[in-house]
């Protein structure tokens, strides 16, 4: 291990007093993710002035009232560029996402729902009654390149105003980096998942992305 660290085949970073060991390319990807999320979160945004009234309209249409934490999440989603919504099964994530989606669709023409796998995307579509795709399909794989490249990237950005990403704990670091690279500079990113699920890869998000809700 010492030899790998001294040759920089492995690298370390310390967060909150804990030292982590990285492969260089994954460390670079995580730092790029943190920087991109930080840039997105600094773009000015304000919640619609009618937001509370709009939430009440949704409640009346559905015949139930949102829990205080759900209302907080909805307000946060409509007033932030970057948000993390996390909770275990039965905590109301789907109901909250549906409310957020309804409000976003009233404001924007281009809202995308995606997930890391086809099964997760199908489930997301069923729960929201809204078209959802895998991240790969959203970015569109360029099969002519001979390697894993995407048609949508920094030079050919996605046209969406909002991207809601489900099953976030299962998203590969490099894939998430590619998604952020293809997002427009003022895009809203909502990351949804279960904090208690085993993550596929560790993503450290720095201070600029602090708008989040954890239940």
Say what each PLM segment does.
Residues 1-206, 210:
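Conserved ATP-binding/catalytic motifs of P-loop helicase motor domains
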């Amino acid at each position: 291990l010492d030899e790998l660290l001294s040759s920089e085949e492995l690298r370390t970073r310390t967060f909150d007093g804990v030292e982590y060991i990285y492969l260089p390319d994954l460390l670079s990807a995580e730092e790029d993710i943190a920087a991109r999320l930080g840039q997105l979160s600094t773009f000015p945004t304000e919640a619609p002035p009618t937001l509370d009234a709009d939430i009440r309209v949704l409640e009346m249409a559905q015949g139930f009232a949102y829990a205080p934490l759900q209302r907080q999440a909805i307000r946060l989603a409509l007033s932030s560029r970057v948000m993390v919504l996390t909770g275990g099964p039965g905590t109301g994530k789907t109901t909250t996402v549906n409310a957020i989606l309804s409000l976003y669709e009233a404001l924007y023409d281009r809202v995308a729902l995606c997930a890391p796998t086809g099964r997760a995307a199908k489930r997301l579509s069923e729960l929201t009654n809204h078209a959802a795709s895998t991240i790969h399909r959203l970015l569109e794989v360029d099969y002519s390149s001979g390697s894993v490249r995407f048609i949508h990237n920094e030079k050919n950005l996605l046209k969406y105003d909002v991207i809601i990403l489900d099953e976030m704990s299962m998203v590969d670091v490099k894939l998430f980096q590619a998604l952020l690279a293809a997002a427009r500079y003022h895009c809203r990113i909502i990351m949804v998942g279960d904090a208690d699920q085993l993550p596929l890869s560790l993503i450290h998000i720095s201070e600029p992305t602090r708008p989040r809700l954890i239940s």
